[in-house]
Amino acid sequence: MQTEVTCPAGTIVGVERDGVRAFESIPYSRIVGAFDDPLPAEQGLLIDASVPRPGTASLSVTTPGTAKPGADHPVVVWIHGGRFEHGDHTETFTNPDDFARAGVVQVRVGYRLKFPGFLPLHTDAPGHYRGVADCAEALSWIQRNIEAFGGDPTNVTVVGQSAGAAIALWLARRDHYKGEFRRVLAMSPAFPRAPFESRKWATRGALSTPLTREALNQLYRDNEPKMQRGYQRFRTQYITDCALGPHPLDATELAEVDLVVTSTREEFIGHGAALDRAHLG
């Protein structure tokens, strides 16, 4: 059954099923160039959020079917993992329907990956990564709009796994934290073991282009497959590590927010099962 929410972002049309409302792949930002910082999404739009559409600058919201504006349900923001190079906000193994039936609004956030998301540029501020900036823009969108979905913007928990946990912790740094979430649950956070400066030569060799915003935006526009091939060449040199990602995390730089850092015992069990299903194990 069709359902809709009207909020500052616009009128968002989703679906209601089995006591749960789902709003899929809502754009939360505008990305002019692949290596540019995100801009806030346009407001006042009519948005078809009835089906998931993979995309980096989108998020999905799942709410209890009875949620009304101002209901103040707690909000869980899920940032997916994937070694900073794969994953998507459309993943549903986080069981959003179960969260909704328990009275929790869940938001799943997509962000830029690989070189567009995590290749530092010399003109960037220290500690700045576009993939992290995407997630920060998503949190700002949530602050502006989630109350219309029945969520409480003052009771937001950011949850991440692997690369997503690293991003969650990075967002909790004092130079990034803007008070848009109350607590963090970081499960098996994964960071590169070496700074990007030690890998810059490999990046230049893989892309054969200057590492400037203008040159990289041009390469992405003109020949995205070449950039993807370049990333594959680059990352094969770091198969036992995250090839890119925030680095380094200093715990003394974290803001005063409630924080749980833990590990997941069976986070890779699905990989073996997938290989078995494909008869590759």
Residue ranges and their predicted role:
Residues T56, P126-E147:
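Alpha/beta-hydrolase active-site loop
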Residues A165-H176:
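Short glycine-enriched nucleophile-adjacent loop
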Residues K178, R183-G281:
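Substrate-access "cap/lid" subdomains that shape
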Residues F149-Q161:
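Alpha/beta-hydrolase fold nucleophile elbow
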Residues G160-A163, S188:
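Catalytic nucleophile serine of serine hydrolases
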Residues P64-A71, D97, E147-D152, D175-K178, ...:
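Surface-exposed acidic, glycine-flexible loop patches that form ligand/cofactor-binding
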Residues M1-P126, R265-E267:
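Non-catalytic accessory segments of hydrolases
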Residues R130-D134, S162-I167:
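Active-site loop->helix "elbow" adjoining a glycine-rich segment at hydrolase catalytic centers
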